[in-house]
Each structure stands twice: as structure tokens, then as C-alpha cells.
Amino acid sequence: KAEPELFDKYPEIYKEVPAVVRTQRKPKRPLPKGANTICCTFKRFRAFYNWCIERGYTQNNPFANFKGIGTEKYGRPYYISVAEVEKIADFDLSANPALAVQRDIFVFQCLIGCRVSDLMRMTNDSVIDGAVEYIPDKTKGERPEVLRVPLNNRAKEILSRYADSKKGNKLLPFISPQKYNDAIKKIFTQCGITRIVTVLNPTTGNEEKRPINEIASSHLARRTFIGNIYKEVKDPNLVGALSGHKEGSKAFARYRDIDEEMKQD
């Protein structure tokens, strides 16, 4: 958290060891880091030292008596309802064809629940016997597992709509992840989905109330898939088989209390 102040106090270190090696730009003052970012960074360093110790590269373990790593803290996931997904899917965006394309991709992502990195790697070969099959990139190193997500009629309709208009073998006409996120915010605004949601500020850790259209992103599509499926089946093993969450995942556990109706059951 003190990195911005350290940058001001020791600028020569950042000049000697820049964050980006191949650049002629003057090092920028770092932004404050959130508690979750700091926690994850410490965990990676600890794993690296454990790896070195196991292989005999060093006996130095700076984490042996260090108790300050802590745990990540996340707010309750917010997502959009099935009705809101349908509203977005059916909204007239004919005045902005480029935005309409990204709307279709977002709706498709809501229907299969993958991460954006996996979505943009998909090709026509990813569709097998009426379902999307893929190995999540995030977990392929530790537990490679093929996920198979059946396609409903709307998802199949979206794929057929772009069957002859794509470049190469891409499943859909993707743009960069950042431009995709920007488009999603515009889509929510135009469709009138602007309700207030409660979120945790990742830097301060404080609770905030924000319009959902201002913070909507590709990951909201994944949360929407998980939240709506879990609301219907209430079986974490089935939902995990479709989303790729391993049994007992802390991230997946957060979805278990996100629906008011479920709390009344």
C-alpha cells in the first residue's frame, strides 16, 4: 500500500529496475494496491520460496515466521437476472450494429459462463454435438479438465447469426477484452439496466453503492451464468461441473447466499 510513497522516496530504484524493461518512458508513479492484490502477491512469493527450498536452491525462508499475509476478502457477487439477460438480448440496437455484435457475444457468454480469456480462444471446433467444450486456461496447469456446457436455443441462434461473417476460425467476432468491457457498459446503459448494487472497493475495502452499468464487465457474464444456474438447481457439484469451480472453492462458496429467495427456502 505504501508503494506510491516509496516511489517518491526512492525513484532511482524504479529507474534501475523498471516494471517494463523494453521501454523508454519515464516510470509512472504506482497506484495504491488493494489488500487482495497484496495478499495474492505475498502468496506467490511464498510459493516461489517453497519451490526453491524443496529443490535445494536455498534454505532461506523469509515466510517461516511471517504471519501477515492474511486472506482475500470479496463482496457478495452481483449478477443480472434471466429477465435482464433477455431484455439485453431483445433490445433494439440496430442503430449501432457494432454494439449489437458485442451485445450478442455478452449474451452468449452469459449462457455458457466461461471466463473472457477462454471465450476469446474459442473457435468453431469448440462446438461439439450441441455443446461448447473447452479446458479453462486458468486451471489447466494444476487440474486440466474439459468443461462441456450444452447450448440452448438462443446460444445456437447467436452462433448461426455469425456463421458466415467471421474472420478465420473464431467462434464469434471478438474484439479486445478492454474494448469488450467498454461496450458492455454502453450496452447496459442503452438497455436501461442501471440499478444500484453493493460492491467492495478493491483498493480501500470499503462498501460502495454503484450503478451496475458503470461497473458491468465480461466477468459479470460469468457470475450471471453461475448465479442463475445455482438459483435453479441448488447443486454446487453440478454448477461446478459447468463453471469449472473445484469442490470447496472459496470463490464458488460466495455464490451460495446471493439470492434473496434462496435465503427464504
Segments (PLM) and residue ranges:
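Conserved tyrosine-mediated DNA breakage-rejoining catalytic core shared by Y-recombinases
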Residues: 68, 112, 121-160
